[in-house]
Amino acid sequence: MKLLILACFVALALARAKEELNASGETVESLSSSEESITHISKEKIEKLKREEQQQTENERQNKIHQFPQPQPLAHPYTEPIPYPILPQNILPLAQVPVVVPLLHPEVMKDSKAKETIVPKRKGMPFPKSPAEPFVEGQSLTLTDFEVLSLPLLQSLMHQIPQPVPQTPMFAPQPLLSLPQAKVLPVPQQVVPFPQRDMPFQALLLYQDPLLGPLQGFYPVPQPVAPVYNPV
């Protein structure tokens, strides 16, 4: 009986030892698993930190690149030809505005032709140069002196064409010893035929001769010409 009791106690002790060993093994396994989990977690944290550092460095580089002025792309880099619509050939051309041409009336044409036939073109005729005679100041004639001339001379002067004033040589002023009396110049006898018409008084002043003064020398003065006479 004692042997059986001892054997039971030994079996119980072995069972307890096995249980303790199993418990210790489980604890060891749990500890190892916990260590592995801790190492895995630590590795993950380290990798996350490395990734964050890499992202920060990349962001800093991109910020530095954007700070420099970059050439902006053109709005239209490639200009394409604008398509024009092709007009059909059956379209009529645009209506043109009629141009008004000035027309002359037959009466105006007749008047212009009649004037050309009545008034012929005048041609300048050579006028012989006559020697100039010195005159004293105050020798210009007035309209009252024209009455002295005869009527045929007046009629001949009416048809005379105004000619340019002849050029006379200029001399130095010379002192006069005595004042000569006023004399009437002879009327030139050369008369050029011209159609009868009224001559204005301003045209008569074109006939001028030089006048010799005591200080001024030669200067033009009006030549005696008869007033305009219009026969009825």
From Swiss-Prot:
Subcellular location field: Secreted
Location (main, coarse): secreted
Ranges of compositional bias, category Basic and acidic residues: 48-63
Entry keywords, A to Z: Glycoprotein, Milk protein, Phosphoprotein, Secreted, Signal
Question: Which residues lie within the region annotated Disordered?
Answer: 48-74
The Phosphothreonine modification is found at T27
Sugar-modified residues: N22
Q: Which domain of life is it from?
A: Eukaryota
What is this protein's function per UniProt? Important role in determination of the surface properties of the casein micelles.
Q: Describe the family membership recorded for this protein in Swiss-Prot or TrEMBL.
A: Belongs to the beta-casein family.
Q: What is this protein called?
A: Beta-casein
Q: What is the scientific name of the source organism?
A: Sus scrofa
